[in-house]
Amino acid sequence: MTIKYTEEKNFTSQQVADLFLSVRWVVGKYPDRLHKALMNSSRVISAWDGDRLVGLIRVMDDSELVCFINYVLVHPDYHGQGIAGHLLEMVKEAYKSYLYINVMIGDSKNASFYEKHGFKIKEDSLPMQYRN
């Protein structure tokens, strides 16, 4: 199987919802809102196995200095194939002129993945969130 990567936002609401639900992310229950959010994101790189959406990374940026990686996800059927790492490296390359690439890790067990790709834990920072 050959995985193809693209920055074209050519995915449907259903494809996106299926991917997010495959990893049990609640936003997959809101396919239209999720699709709209992705379409309005600074950058989305997706991974495809034929016409099946199997991975995705989403970035928001200020166009000059800082970007934030919001999502990195890969369908469980495709775990262990280096897809997430490839997506992350594509973002690092795209934003190499920026001062900072930040990521909010949803689960601390995933920190080592980012550390393998050169990210450092900021001991003096604490992530916060307001939820409606």
Model-derived features with residue positions:
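Conserved active-site tyrosine of GNAT-family acetyltransferases
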Residues: 114
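Short amphipathic alpha-helix that is part of the acyltransferase structural core
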Residues: 1-29, 125
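A short helix-loop-beta-strand connector motif used in the catalytic cores of GNAT acetyltransferases and
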Residues: 35-46, 100
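Conserved acetyl-CoA-binding loop-helix of GNAT-fold acetyltransferases
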Residues: 74, 80-93
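Conserved beta-strand in the GNAT
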Residues: 46, 52-61, 65-73
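Conserved GNAT acetyl-CoA-binding A-motif
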Residues: 93-106
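Conserved acetyl-CoA-binding loop of GNAT-fold acetyltransferases
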Residues: 117-124
